[in-house]
Amino acid sequence: MTPAIFSPTTLPPSTATWPCSTSQKLITVRSPLKFKCRATSSSSSITDFDLYDLLGIDRSSDKSQIKSAYRALQKRCHPDIAGDPGHDMAIILNEAYQLLSDPISRQAYDKEQAKLEELRGYTGKPIYSVWCGPETEQRAAFVDEVKCVGCLKCALCAEKTFAIETAYGRARVVAQWADPESKIKEAIEACPVDCISMVERSDLAPLEFLMSKQPRGNVRIGVGNTVGERVSNVFVDVKKFQERYAKAMSRTTKETSQREVQISAVEAIRSISNWLYWRSSPYTKPLSPESNMSLTFTKRKKAVDPDIRKLQDVVAAMKQADQSGRTKEKGSAYLLGEDYWSPSNAALPSSGNNNGSKASSNPQVTRKTFPSEEKPTSRRENRRQFRIKKFPIGTAIVAVFLVQYQASYRAASELNDHIGGSLALSIVNSPWQQILLAGVTWYFIGAMLLQLVEAVQHKLEDKET
C-alpha cells in the first residue's frame, strides 16, 4: 500500500506519541517538515477507511470545513470527556486530519479510494448468468452489450442461454450452457456484429461486472446505429481488474489486533459524528445538559443517533442484495422475470424465407407465461368471478322450479284479458315464458345482491386496515 506522508507541523498537541507500533520505522524524507511512517508489519492503515464519512463531510470540502469537523469531533473524543476509549479515537482523528489537511496526502488518498471504488460491489461471482453446464467446462459465453444491436437472433437460436434485457433492448447471457453447444454456435454465427464471444470461465465474473459499468443507450436498428459509447475495452481491462481485486483481497485478509482497535475507534467517532449532525440540525430540539455530556461507547456498535440518509442507503443495498440473491437461486428462471423478453418459437423465421416480407423480418417477441407466475391477487379475482357466476345461477334455478311448481296448479285457469295487452296476456298464460322470465329476472337480482355484499365486505376491510 502506498505510504501516507504526514506533516509534523500540523500535528495537534494531544498526540505527543506517534501512533506507530514498535515494529514500524520512521524514515526521514529530505524535506525537514515532512516524514512518513512505513509499516514493516501487516498492520492496517487509516487509509482503509472512508475518512470523509468518518468526519461527516463531503469529498469536495475545503480545508476550513475539514478543520471545523475535526475540532468538533475532537472536543467529544478527548480522553478527559470520553474516557479511555477517547485515546484511540483521538489518534484516529489526528491521523485523518493530518492526511486530509495536506494536499499531497489527500490527493494520494483520493486516488487510492478511486481504485477501491472500482471494486465496490464485486463479489467474484457472475452478475447476470448462472452456471448450468458441467463443472469440468472452462468456457463461457459472453455478450459485448455495448456492441450489440438488439437483433434478437441469438435469443431466437438459443432461447435458454440468451435473453434480451428490457432496459436497453440488448442481448445478454442468462444461463451458461443451458442449450446444446450446437445451438450456441449457431447463435454466435447468426450475430451480425460479432458481439458474442467464448471466454474463460475465470474471466466471466469480472467481464460481467465491468460490462455493467459501461454506458449504454437504447438500440436503434438501421443504418448508422450508434449502439453505445464505450468507456474502455472490457477484454483489455479484465486482467488489470483481477490483479487489483486480488491485491485488495490479500490486503483485507491481513487483519491484526491493531485493526480491531482502529475499527472500534472509528465506529465510536462515527456515532459522535451522527450525534453532532442531529444536534446541529434545525429540525431537532436542543438536547439537555445531561445528554450533552453523555457518551456511551460500546465496542463494534453502530451510531447511537442514526443518520437517516445512511440508513436509507443501507436499506437500498440490502434490498438489492436480496433481489440479486433470489434471482441467482432461480437459475434459468431469469427468463421468467420482467427484466427480460423471452421470444416464442413461433417468432423464429424460416431459413428459406430470409428475403421475405417486413413482417417476417421483424419477429414479434412475446413473453412466456407459467402457472407459477400467477399472483395471489389474480387467484382471488378468479375465486370472486366463480362466486359471481355461481350465486346468480342458483337463484335463477330456484325461481324456475318455483314458477313451474305454481304453474302446474294453475294449468286449468287462464286469463282472457290483460291490461298489458296481448303480449302480456300470452306471457301470463304461457308457462314456459313465465319460467324463462323468472329465471332471467332472478339471475340479475342474485348478481346485484352479490355485488352489494362484496361492497360491504370491502368497506369493512378498508376500515380494519
From Swiss-Prot:
Induction: Induced by salt stress. Residues 50-113 form the J domain. SMART domains: DnaJ (SM00271). Residues 370-384 have a biased composition (Basic and acidic residues). Disruption phenotype: Altered root hair development and reduced hair length. It is found in: Plastid, Chloroplast. The keyword Chloroplast applies. Residues 1-38 form a transit peptide. GO terms for cellular component: chloroplast. InterPro entries: DnaJ_domain (IPR001623), J_dom_sf (IPR036869). The keyword Transit peptide applies. Keywords: Chaperone, Chloroplast, Plastid, Stress response, Transit peptide. Residues 346-385 are annotated as: Disordered. It comes from the Eukaryota. Expressed in roots, exclusively in the stele. Residues 350-362 have a biased composition (Low complexity). PANTHER family: CHAPERONE PROTEIN DNAJ C76, CHLOROPLASTIC. May function together with HSC70 chaperone to assist protein folding and prevent protein aggregation during salt stress in the chloroplast. Involved in root development. Required for the position-dependent cell fate determination during root hair development. Belongs to the DnaJ family. This is Chaperone protein dnaJ C76, chloroplastic. It comes from Arabidopsis thaliana. The lineage of its organism: Eukaryota, Viridiplantae, Streptophyta, Embryophyta, Tracheophyta.
